[in-house]
Amino acid sequence: MDPKKIARINELAKKKKTEGLTPEEKVEQAKLREEYIEGYRRAVRHHIEGIKIVDEEGNDVTPEKLRQVQREKGLHGRSLDDPNS
């Protein structure tokens, strides 16, 4: 997210605590917060999709649901053609 938008979120939060927001500012704040949260969720999802879990013996113990997502995206050498990957 653009640093200017983050600064605006913080500015509106501070103003809300000190003097309150106008109805227009409340709408702006809600839109900016939603945009920020959506970007954060995308980043976390992307990070989790890139994780491969192995046990102490080196065996892949990644949950099947995550493996399926990785197969669809071709991550970690997983392939839709090989259900054991």
Curated annotation (Swiss-Prot):
* UniProt GO cellular component terms: cytoplasm
Give the UniProt keywords, A-Z: Cytoplasm
Question: Which domain of life does the protein's organism represent?
Answer: Bacteria
Spans annotated as Disordered: 62-85
What compartments host this protein?
A: Cytoplasm
Q: Which SUPFAM superfamilies match?
A: YnzC-like
What Pfam families does the record tag this protein with? DUF896
Record bears the keyword Cytoplasm: yes
Please report which protein family the annotation says this sequence is part of.
Belongs to the UPF0291 family.
Q: What is this protein called?
A: UPF0291 protein SPD_1303
The scientific name of the source species is Streptococcus pneumoniae serotype 2 (strain D39 / NCTC 7466)
